[in-house]
């Protein structure tokens, strides 16, 4: 177990300490072996009611063309994904509060579970309790909701303080998701302007105590149509791209050591930033050795995926390239198993169905 001093020393170090990397890799091999679970990700809409100051699909971004994928198109995507051998999918989109949207999600989850028998991860923001319960009942067993930054004071540096952006509701929703029975994924945004190492430590402490079944973290990458981008143009101090990349790898290693049995995602943002410095195989090898054991290739149609512009220069890769990049990074890509985390079975005392 890592002490506060050890964690702070790691975060302040210029590189990833060798002993941290060795311990994280040791824990990873014990609980996950060399397996990397692939989830086929589809971003069904870039419509969102929120206006987070760092996010490219914020409601106030009037320059962004909005889309909402049709049911028949998603059905075809699911069919193609199944042909490739996937057993797990992830569905993501902006936060929308409307009965029409809820019923579309119900229909989608029912299709994914009843027709294709997918294990389903969803990420659609802070939806109402009854909607979250019904989505779970229909077959969506995993939910990703990042808290972004755990300090309420810092949280409101990057969000309006209104009914759409409520820190307390965000945390309450995380607790609710776990109570409903979801495998809950959460995480922070690393290296935001106006944040410091001490803020990262608070984020780490929250995740350690919350014990999520999945950790989904990523480095902050600016998006030109956001308020934060304007601050950066004015020369506001920020962690460099290399620092944000290394900090993300350090946090992956820290979480692997602290949580042991949870799944940890090598996020698209991490890959986007990392491939500015290294080839894809090298980035994945580093992430997996630090403890990541999940990646999510994007299956959003090409005409839509660039519109899901959370940040600039997002890395896009076809299934085949990702699959072989995992193999070439000396790990084993897994499509035909659900890849449920051991933490979920331990907490619920269920028999293990990986």
List PLM regions with ranges:
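Hydrophobic positions in alpha-helices of CheY-like receiver
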Residues: 108-112, 177, 255, 259
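Catalytic cores of alpha/beta
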Residues: 128-135, 193-207, 272-289
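Conserved, mostly hydrophobic/aromatic
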Residues: 24, 52, 145, 177, ...
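Auxiliary Fe-S-binding modules of radical SAM enzymes
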Residues: 1-15, 76, 82, 208-354
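Generic structural signal for well-ordered alpha-helices
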Residues: 40, 74, 78, 105-110, ...
């Amino acid at each position: 177990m890592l002490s506060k001093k050890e964690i702070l020393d790691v975060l302040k170090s210029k590189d990833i300490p060798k002993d941290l990397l060795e311990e994280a890799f040791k824990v990873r091999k014990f609980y996950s072996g060399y397996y990397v679970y692939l989830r086929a990700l589809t971003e069904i809409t870039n419509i969102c009611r929120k206006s987070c100051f760092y996010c490219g699909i914020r409601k106030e971004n009037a320059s962004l063309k909005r889309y909402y994928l049709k049911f028949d198109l998603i059905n075809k995507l699911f069919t193609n994904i199944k042909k490739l051998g996937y057993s797990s999918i992830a569905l993501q989109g902006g936060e929308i509060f409307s009965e029409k949207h809820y019923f579309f999600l119900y229909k989608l989850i029912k299709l994914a579970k009843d027709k294709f028998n997918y294990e389903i991860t969803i990420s659609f923001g802070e939806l109402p309790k009854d909607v979250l319960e019904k989505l779970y009942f229909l077959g969506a067993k995993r939910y990703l909701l990042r808290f972004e930054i755990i300090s309420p004071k810092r949280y409101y540096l990057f969000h309006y303080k209104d009914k759409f952006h409520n820190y307390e509701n965000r945390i309450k929703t995380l607790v609710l998701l776990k109570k409903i029975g979801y495998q809950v994924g959460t995480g922070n945004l690393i290296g935001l302007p106006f944040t410091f190492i001490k803020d990262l430590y608070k984020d780490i402490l929250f995740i350690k105590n919350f014990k999520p079944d999945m950790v989904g973290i990523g480095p902050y990458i600016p998006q030109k149509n956001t308020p934060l981008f304007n601050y950066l143009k004015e020369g506001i101090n920020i962690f460099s791209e290399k620092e944000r990349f290394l900090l993300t790898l350090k946090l992956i290693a820290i979480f692997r050591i602290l949580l042991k049995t949870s799944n940890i995602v090598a996020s698209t943002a991490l890959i986007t930033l990392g491939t500015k410095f290294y080839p894809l195989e090298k980035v994945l090898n580093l992430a997996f050795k630090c403890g990541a054991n999940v990646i999510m290739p994007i299956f959003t149609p090409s005409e839509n995926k660039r519109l899901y512009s959370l940040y600039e220069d997002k890395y896009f890769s076809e299934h085949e390239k990702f699959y072989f990049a995992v193999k070439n990074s000396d790990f084993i890509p897994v499509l035909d198993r659900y890849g449920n985390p051991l933490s979920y079975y331990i907490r619920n005392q269920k028999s293990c169905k990986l």
